[in-house]
């Protein structure tokens, strides 16, 4: 309040006003800042002062024949004085209004075809159902998601060739349309866009939207298919979520879903054949999804799912270094380890042969209802930061992390024999035996883990062996974060701060 009063007093003095309005800006650093480079430094300000001028627009001389000098109200639409430095005409914003109302009209037949993705979005929203709104803590995880519903999954290069062929067919340049989908789309679009008067550049932009998968790395708490991502801002905030059912499906989400189902079936069949790799590759090559060869889809499609990754790896494609354990996707974000077989004794004196990971590693763990950051050394959990929807989800994540850490106190917490089998009645491997055991009852595990006093860190809280929260004590190395924990994209490396326990998220 004092500051405002002081400013008011200053502004009431005529000298202040004079200094602010009359003095020139002659400081070289300021001039340099606003004049170096072609990039506009303050677009909003520029637009404001341009629009305050009488003729902020320049146009080609032909405008003088097409637009009257004055409108019906007698306001001048363009000035006879030339734009300094070019032979263009200075034009008023009112001329745009005149043109929109009285300018030539053209056939609208191509608009729904060019702006197809927008029209389809409107339809999906019109037929979608919204509500109710729930207020609760949202656990969001950054995931790589598809933000462009309805696209045909072409690669950027394939799409570029199609666009050039459709929009600029006479331009020189080698364009080889090889894939089935490229040829079909090109033929379809050429027919649709005959005699199209919309600017070629606009057509090219819209075609790109229609042909290429665009992905972003966004915090998501619910559905990750593109029809949910397009309404992300309507369905989830920091402390609320709104239920939403999309008013239609799109081809790319169907393909993603079908790809997962096909890959799972293929992997299942291949595992029981005499030569799993050869049989898997043969099936991938002979399978089609929506009329497109599965191998072509696998090359383009970024869906991260276990069976899909197995098929990609078999084809020699790059996959992200993630793996599943206990219903969580683990992604190593830093560190490395070597595997070594080791025999350990459980609390029941049963001998287990486990493959020990030697070395320091950091992982993100992503499950359906909880996420975590795990830092571990050889058979030792250093730190676990968990975030989850409820006590049950947090407990699940803690159990998985404790088992994954391979700590001795976890193995010693086993009571009774480990003899879990899978559906085919085969014994599970030792790590899964341990996991099943503690998923049934984790009381001894939590009690034996040990507790420690904790520092008061914002957004973080301790958790006791009986799963009650505490601000003073916590199970050793374990903290609960009120914010979500981010999943990493396979392409994005994010530096982790290894300094202190007190970082709730590595970003």
From Swiss-Prot:
InterPro entries: Flu_PB2_2nd, Flu_PB2_CAP-bd, Flu_PB2_middle, Flu_PB2_N, PB2_helical
Functional note: May participate in the inhibition of type I interferon induction through inhibition of the host mitochondrial antiviral signaling protein MAVS. The knockout of PB2-S1 has no detectable effects on laboratory infected mice.
Protein name in UniProt: PB2-S1
Keywords associated with the record: Host cytoplasm, Host mitochondrion
Organism: Influenza A virus (strain A/Brevig Mission/1/1918 H1N1) (Influenza A virus (strain A/South Carolina/1/1918 H1N1))
Encoding gene (name): PB2
GO CC field: host cell cytosol; host cell mitochondrion
Pfam family, one: Flu_PB2_4th
Subcellular location: Host mitochondrion; Host cytoplasm, Host cytosol
């Amino acid at each position: 309040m004092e500051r405002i009063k002081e400013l008011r007093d200053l502004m009431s003095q005529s000298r202040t006003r004079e200094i602010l309005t009359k003095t020139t800006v002659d400081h070289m650093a300021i001039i340099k800042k606003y004049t170096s480079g072609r990039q506009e430094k303050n677009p909003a300000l520029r637009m404001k002062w341009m629009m305050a001028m009488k003729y902020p627009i320049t146009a080609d001389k032909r405008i003088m024949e097409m637009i009257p000098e004055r409108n019906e109200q007698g306001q001048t639409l363009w000035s006879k004085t030339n734009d300094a430095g070019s032979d263009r005409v200075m034009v008023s914003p009112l001329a745009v209004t005149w043109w929109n109302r009285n300018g030539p009209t053209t056939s609208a037949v191509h608009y729904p075809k060019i702006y197809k993705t927008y029209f389809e979005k409107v339809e999906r929203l019109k037929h979608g159902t919204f509500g109710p709104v729930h207020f609760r803590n949202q656990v969001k995880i950054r995931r790589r998601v598809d933000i462009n519903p309805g696209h045909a999954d072409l690669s950027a290069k394939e799409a570029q060739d199609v666009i050039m062929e459709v929009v600029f067919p006479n331009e020189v340049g080698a364009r080889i349309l090889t894939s089935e989908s490229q040829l079909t789309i090109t033929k379809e679009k050429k027919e649709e866009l005959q005699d199209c008067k919309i600017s070629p550049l606009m057509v090219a932009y819209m075609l790109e939207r229609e042909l290429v998968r665009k992905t972003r790395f966004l915090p998501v708490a619910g559905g990750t298919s593109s029809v949910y991502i397009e309404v992300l801002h309507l369905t989830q905030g920091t402390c609320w979520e709104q239920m939403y059912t999309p008013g239609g499906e799109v081809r790319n989400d169907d393909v993603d879903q079908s790809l997962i189902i096909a890959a799972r079936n293929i992997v299942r069949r291949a595992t029981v054949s005499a030569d799993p790799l050869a049989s898997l590759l043969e099936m991938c090559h002979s399978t089609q999804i929506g009329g497109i060869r599965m191998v072509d889809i696998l090359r383009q499609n970024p869906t991260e799912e276990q069976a899909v990754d197995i098929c990609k790896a078999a084809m020699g494609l790059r996959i992200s270094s993630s793996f599943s354990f206990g219903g969580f996707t683990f992604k190593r974000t830093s560190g490395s380890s070597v595997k070594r077989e080791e025999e350990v004794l459980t609390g029941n004196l049963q001998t287990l042969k486990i493959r020990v990971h030697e070395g320091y590693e950091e992982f993100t763990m992503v499950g359906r209802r909880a996420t975590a950051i795990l830092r571990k050394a050889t058979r030792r959990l250093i730190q676990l930061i968990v975030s989850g929807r409820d006590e049950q989800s947090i407990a699940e994540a803690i159990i998985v992390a404790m088992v994954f850490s391979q700590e001795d106190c976890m193995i010693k917490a086993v009571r009774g024999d480990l003899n879990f089998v899978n559906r085919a009645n085969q014994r599970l491997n030792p790590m899964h035996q341990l996991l099943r055991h503690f998923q049934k009852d984790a009381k001894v595990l939590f009690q034996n883990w040990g507790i420690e006093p904790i520092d008061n860190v914002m957004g973080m809280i301790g958790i006791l062996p009986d799963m009650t929260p505490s601000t003073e004590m916590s199970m050793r190395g374990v903290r609960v974060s009120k914010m979500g924990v981010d999943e990493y994209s396979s392409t994005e490396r994010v530096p982790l701060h290894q300094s202190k326990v007190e970082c709730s998220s590595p970003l």
